[in-house]
């Protein structure tokens, strides 16, 4: 049925051109190295969690994305429209997981480092003051909205290019943030905190601010503006 509808909606030549484009050989995605040691975020996030989160969970998304893209490439080359369309959820889930975690690792920094000191000046500081009235208000609002996510997902501080403001947004599962430029992301999947904080999300959310990389947030905001 999907194949029949697709063929009716688009000329055959157009479909062949589109599928040929998708079948272009791509390099495999790889797990990015952490910019710090697994125990660098302790006591806020344990070394055990960081090791499992990075080497097992993130690696699974990378593997899933590579497998889905390989299947899509084959389906596209074969003109198998139904299979190509059916792969979209896997591409979204695993691709989102890879993107989200790659951003997440970089917006964290070692305990006690210069990067985790709450800024008192700069572009990010000024924007937070203007949009939230200060960092404590930002933390309170972002923690509340992230904790309220039903099931798994992500809490984001994103920059809205239309309004030129920082806004708090949540996304379900591994959906990437598309409506805003990601500035800070917080993983609220259980694998990010359960071994250490059990089911007490507020404790995890309060602790993670001790290792937020404000220098990375400053850099992302400057690039977004």
Swiss-Prot record:
SUPFAM superfamilies documented for this protein: Fe,Mn superoxide dismutase (SOD), C-terminal domain, Fe,Mn superoxide dismutase (SOD), N-terminal domain
Annotated keywords: Antioxidant, Cytoplasm, Manganese, Metal-binding, Mitochondrion, Oxidoreductase, Transit peptide
Entry-linked InterPro entries: Fe/Mn_Superoxide_Dismutase, Mn/Fe_SOD, Mn/Fe_SOD_BS, Mn/Fe_SOD_C, Mn/Fe_SOD_N, Mn/Fe_SOD_N_sf, SOD_C_sf
Phenotype of gene-disrupted mutants: Decreases cellular superoxide dismutase activity. Sensitive to thermal stress, and menadione (induces oxidative stress). Decreases virulence in a mouse model of infection.
Entry-linked Pfam families: Sod_Fe_C, Sod_Fe_N
GO BP: removal of superoxide radicals; symbiont defense to host-produced reactive oxygen species
Reactions that this protein is recorded to catalyse: 2 superoxide + 2 H(+) = H2O2 + O2
Cofactor(s) essential for the protein: Mn(2+)
Cofactor note: Binds 1 Mn(2+) ion per subunit.
Transit peptide: 1-27
Cited PROSITE patterns: SOD_MN
Keyword Manganese listed: yes
GO cellular component: cytosol; mitochondrion
Binding positions for Mn(2+) per the UniProt entry: 53, 101, 187, 191
Purpose of the protein: Destroys radicals which are normally produced within the cells and which are toxic to biological systems.
Family affiliation: Belongs to the iron/manganese superoxide dismutase family.
Designated name of the protein: Superoxide dismutase [Mn], mitochondrial
Species this chain originates from: Cryptococcus neoformans var. grubii serotype A (strain H99 / ATCC 208821 / CBS 10515 / FGSC 9487)
Gene behind this protein: SOD2
């Amino acid at each position: 049925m999907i194949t029949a509808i697709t063929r009716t909606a688009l000329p055959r030549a157009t479909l062949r051109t589109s599928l040929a484009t998708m079948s272009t050989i791509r390099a495999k995605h790889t797990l990015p190295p952490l910019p710090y040691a697994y125990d660098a975020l302790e006591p806020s996030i344990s070394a055990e969690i960081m090791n499992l989160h990075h080497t097992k969970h993130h690696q699974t998304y990378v593997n899933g994305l590579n497998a889905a893209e390989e299947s899509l490439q084959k389906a596209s080359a074969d003109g198998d429209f139904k299979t190509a369309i059916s792969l979209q959820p896997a591409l979204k889930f695993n691709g989102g997981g890879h993107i989200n975690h790659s951003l997440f690792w970089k917006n964290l920094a070692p305990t006690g480092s210069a990067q985790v000191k709450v800024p008192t000046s700069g572009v990010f500081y000024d924007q937070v003051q203007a949009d939230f009235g200060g960092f404590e208000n930002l933390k309170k609002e972002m923690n509340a909205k992230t904790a309220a996510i039903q099931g798994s997902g992500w809490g984001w501080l994103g920059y809205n290019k239309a309004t030129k403001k920082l806004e708090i947004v949540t996304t379900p599962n591994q959906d990437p943030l598309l409506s805003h430029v990601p500035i800070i992301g917080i993983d609220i999947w259980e694998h990010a905190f359960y071994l250490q904080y059990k089911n007490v999300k507020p404790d995890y959310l309060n602790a993670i601010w001790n290792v937020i990389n404000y220098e990375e947030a400053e850099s992302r905001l400057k690039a977004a503006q």
